[in-house]
Amino acid sequence: MSHHFTVNTETAADNRFQLSTDWSDELASRAFDEITLAAETLESHGVTVHLFEDSGIDAPDSVFPNNWFSTHAGGHIAIYPMKAPSRRRERRSDVIEMLKQNYRVQDVIDYSGLEPDGIFLEGTGAMVLDHIDRVAYAARSDRTDPIALERFCTHFNFEPMVFDARDGDGVPIYHTNVLMCVATCFAAIGTGMITDARRRNEVVARLQRSGRDIVHLSNAQIDSFAGNAIELQGKESRILALSTTALAALGDDQRATIEADARIVALDIPTIERAGGSVRCTLAGIHLTPRN
């Protein structure tokens, strides 16, 4: 978590979820407190949380670690090529070493060498991964290059499912994980933002083929980060972590579909959301086997 959290001007050009605001030490402190409380809340529900401090001033988006690395069953870690130079500075060897010390890690595949060629794939922001059916859902953008996506899918045995998605103003969706999330028994997705009707139907059909219920999200709900959620394993059940902003945007029927399989845990992070990301962005999931 960052002590110098602020809106990243390098990423503002293609992330319309970011809000222009005058940032101060007070807002940075508030964001720090939000992440601290969010971690405590998840731990109280039985989720294992590894929280890292970031006292530097040159990585304003370090609160969003899911973009630079991901972990995978079988002991695999991927490190990703990032578009903004400031975001490349988020990569930390101590995080990878912690994972090696606490979990069984077989190999680390580093794609960051693609950056000088202008090829980017920003982790589980660029891709929403179905770890059960092995599908990588990806909305095309400057941060999701098809070459890098193909390499990842080949290395990690995922089927790529690529589509174009735009908001109501015609602006491309910068990260797939603001548009959709895939849980064990359901998927929430802003289908109306997928521009091609045929491809939209194919995406929905692929999700349904896996046996999942579909929670269709409106554009307004996507704007409220309702798609930026993540399923986690709690002490007694699966939980769906999302923000209080996202929860307030959901309808009763949508909540009922989610709660039929997972307990909803809402985290209050309004300051962090001003920087263009919500709960899913703040969490890098661990799919590795613990050593003990």
Residue ranges and their predicted role:
Residues M1-N292:
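The feature marks the mature, well-folded catalytic cores of soluble enzymes
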